[in-house]
């Protein structure tokens, strides 16, 4: 398969170099971050005993590549991870896509032992340099739709103080060189995922999510929008239906998820509420019915009724849910309120699971390169499909109201402002 049309732009970039850009850890802590006095902390304790055989610290490399990530994943990341794993050098990996300072893939690699870190880093640098030399992205993000999109996201997602760290001389977001890569600090979002135990669980899940997306990129025609949207919707239904077995709880979650993505960017043209009803109607009856069958199968624990690809995801989602429930019941999850005002220590899985489900869904969609509009639309589609099938309240399904949008400010809803610039999503 070929890269998307953007990669055929006529201005090739310079060759790959690991550049020495700014250190993201120097950015100020956002309002939704974790203040020094917070109990939400990371796993590293200076007084902890050293274990030579324990996994090393995560390495983070940002690969600035203004094209489809598919060739980067299949021709570089997967072979690199496979080789390092086979040689006993790697304890884990995952990736996310991001746009800050230009479109890039954030690759996270955890050495099997601390002593392996230099080798893992060198091997990653060598593989990335070779790939970018042989398959450079030809599109430059200097003007046009993508530049405007990134500038809009920059304004919406970061405070004025945070933006100052990333401004160029022209007052716009600084762009890193295309076809380059940089080592950056790894900065887990402890407040979002529930502290060190929650971050460890998220990292385990992120590898499964990354593996799934790499396999989908290899075996499916994800360059076709219909295929991509259909896959994402089914994955969302599997995981959300596994986490939330009660129809009403699931519908409430989907409504809030939709309302957040739709309302957070309501001042832009990146969501289109007026088109949801028409697009849903044009789907016909077969797709909504498929979503309802998926929901029924996972709610009943009858994953053998699912296609193999979804069955594996359902089994992983169930294990992820069980591990999250165990952490909750032990009191090992501590979240930070989105306004940064307090810590939240849930002891009831009914409270904790939706708080984790939001970023879990979003980050899998991120790896699939889904857009803001996609997330708003698909959560609307899934909720409406369930309502049309009789789930929850027997009322006519409509797009969530302003009251529903307001509810996203409560615990468990995503936040669009004041995110950590080096965070994991």
PLM feature spans:
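An acidic, charge-biased composition feature
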Residues: 1-8, 32, 38-425
């Amino acid at each position: 398969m070929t890269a998307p049309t953007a990669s055929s732009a006529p201005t090739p970039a310079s060759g790959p170099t690991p550049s020495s850009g700014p250190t993201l850890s120097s950015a100020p802590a956002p309002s939704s971050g974790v203040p020094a006095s917070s109990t939400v902390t990371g796993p590293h304790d200076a007084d902890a005993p050293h274990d030579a055989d324990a996994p090393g610290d995560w390495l983070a490399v940002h690969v600035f590549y203004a094209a489809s990530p598919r060739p980067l994943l299949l021709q570089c990341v997967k072979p690199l991870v496979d080789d390092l794993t086979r040689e006993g050098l790697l304890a884990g990996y995952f990736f996310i896509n991001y746009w800050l300072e230009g479109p890039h893939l954030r690759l996270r690699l955890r050495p099997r032992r601390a002593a392996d870190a230099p080798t893992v880093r060198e091997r990653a640098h060598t593989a990335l340099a070779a790939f970018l030399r042989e398959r450079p992205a030809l599109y430059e993000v200097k003007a046009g739709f993508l530049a405007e999109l990134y500038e809009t996201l920059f304004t919406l997602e970061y405070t004025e103080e945070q933006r100052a760290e990333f401004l160029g001389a022209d007052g716009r977001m600084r762009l890193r060189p295309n076809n380059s890569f940089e080592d950056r600090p790894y900065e887990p979002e402890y407040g979002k995922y529930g502290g060190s135990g929650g971050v460890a669980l998220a990292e385990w899940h992120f590898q499964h999510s990354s593996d799934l997306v790499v396999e989908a990129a290899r075996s499916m025609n994800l360059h076709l929008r219909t295929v991509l949207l259909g896959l994402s919707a089914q994955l969302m239904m599997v995981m959300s239906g596994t986490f939330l077995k009660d129809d009403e709880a699931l519908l409430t979650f989907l409504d809030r998820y939709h309302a957040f993505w739709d309302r957070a960017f309501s001042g832009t043209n990146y969501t289109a509420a007026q088109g949801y009803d028409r697009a849903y109607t044009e789907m016909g009856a077969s797709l909504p019915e498929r979503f309802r069958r998926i929901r029924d199968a996972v709610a009943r624990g009858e994953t053998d009724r699912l296609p193999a690809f979804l069955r594996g995801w359902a089994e992983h989602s169930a294990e992820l849910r069980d591990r999250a429930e165990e952490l909750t019941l032990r009191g090992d999850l501590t979240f930070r309120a989105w306004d940064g005002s307090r810590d939240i220590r849930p002891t009831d899985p009914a409270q904790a699971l939706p708080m984790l489900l939001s970023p879990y869904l979003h980050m899998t969609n991120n790896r699939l390169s889904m857009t803001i509009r996609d997330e708003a639309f698909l959560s609307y589609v899934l909720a409406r499909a369930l309502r049309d099938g009789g789930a929850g309240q027997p009322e006519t399904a409509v797009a969530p109201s302003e009251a529903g949008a307001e509810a996203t400010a409560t615990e468990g809803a995503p936040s669009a402002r004041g995110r950590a610039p080096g965070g994991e999503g």
